[in-house]
């Protein structure tokens, strides 16, 4: 007799946890990207204008709001704890962490050492602040 191997919709992991740490990606400043201040925009606000596919949920969580050059041990521990809580949730399929460029590789190495394998944990950053994006799109569309 064949068993039903389908899973119900309620058991499918469909949530993306977006953890904000600050950095240039969450920065504000002039449209040119020169003279910005890192870590000013909340993770929730970085989602503005992003189309989320039907059936998917993005759950933002602000862990820290700082320039990544200022990250220390306590910040890494707080991030690891937030990741652990999200990874333990069966609805969470993956984690995306917005971060600054200065300490991105140290954060990636630390998380690789302390988090369990299984679900993807992706770090992303930017070389220009979020406030420069509109000007970038305008220049790109005229190219």
Predicted regions, residues:
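Active-site histidine-anchored catalytic micro-motif
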Residues: 1-143
């Amino acid at each position: 007799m064949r068993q039903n191997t389908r899973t119900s919709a309620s058991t499918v992991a469909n949530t993306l946890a977006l953890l904000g740490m600050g950095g240039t990606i969450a920065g504000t400043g002039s449209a040119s990207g020169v003279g910005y201040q890192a870590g000013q925009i909340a993770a929730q606000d970085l989602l503005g204008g992003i189309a989320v596919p039907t059936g998917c949920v993005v759950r933002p969580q602000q862990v820290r709001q700082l320039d990544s050059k200022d990250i220390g041990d306590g910040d890494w521990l707080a991030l690891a704890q937030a990741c652990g809580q999200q990874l333990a949730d069966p609805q969470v399929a993956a984690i995306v962490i917005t971060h600054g460029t200065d300490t991105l590789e140290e954060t990636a190495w630390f998380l690789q050492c302390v988090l369990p394998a299984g679900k993807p944990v992706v770090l992303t950053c930017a070389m220009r602040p979020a406030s420069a994006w509109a000007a970038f799109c305008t220049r790109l569309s005229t190219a």
